[in-house]
UniProtKB/Swiss-Prot annotation:
Heptamer of 7 subunits arranged in a ring. Interacts with the chaperonin GroEL. PROSITE patterns: CHAPERONINS_CPN10. Belongs to the GroES chaperonin family. This is Co-chaperonin GroES. One of its GO terms (biological process) is chaperone cofactor-dependent protein refolding. One of its GO terms (molecular function) is unfolded protein binding. SMART domains: Cpn10 (SM00883). It comes from the Bacteria. The keyword Cytoplasm applies. The keyword Nucleus does not apply. The lineage of its organism: Bacteria, Pseudomonadati, Pseudomonadota, Alphaproteobacteria, Rhodobacterales. It is found in: Cytoplasm. GO terms for cellular component: cytoplasm.
Length: 95
């Protein structure tokens, strides 16, 4: 199943978090926080103004992004857990 976001929504794949701390301690799965970094998998066309004019998206597929801890809605696509969020939930692009 392919999923294309609508309007100003973005589909994001979370990046994997570190398995160890800087001191070498292994972090168990139960103690790991979900990462707030990810890669844009797909984007909608963008939002529209009241006049109907399209507002272009600031992110594109493949961008590494930073988003809020509680951003987005978890969705499962082809057995993979992804996040669907509005572009405004994205804090920035990692360059």
């Amino acid at each position: 199943m392919a999923l294309k976001p609508l309007h100003d929504r973005v589909l994001v794949r979370r990046t994997e978090s570190e398995e160890k701390t800087a001191g070498g301690l292994i972090i168990p799965d139960s103690a790991k926080e979900k990462p707030s970094e990810g890669v844009v998998v797909a984007c909608g066309e963008g939002a529209r103004k009241d006049s109907g004019e399209l507002i272009a998206m600031a992110v594109k597929e493949g961008d590494n992004i930073l988003f809020g801890k509680w951003s987005g809605t978890e969705v499962t696509v082809d057995g993979e857990e992804l996040l669907m969020m509005k572009e405004s939930d994205i804090m920035g692009v990692i360059v």
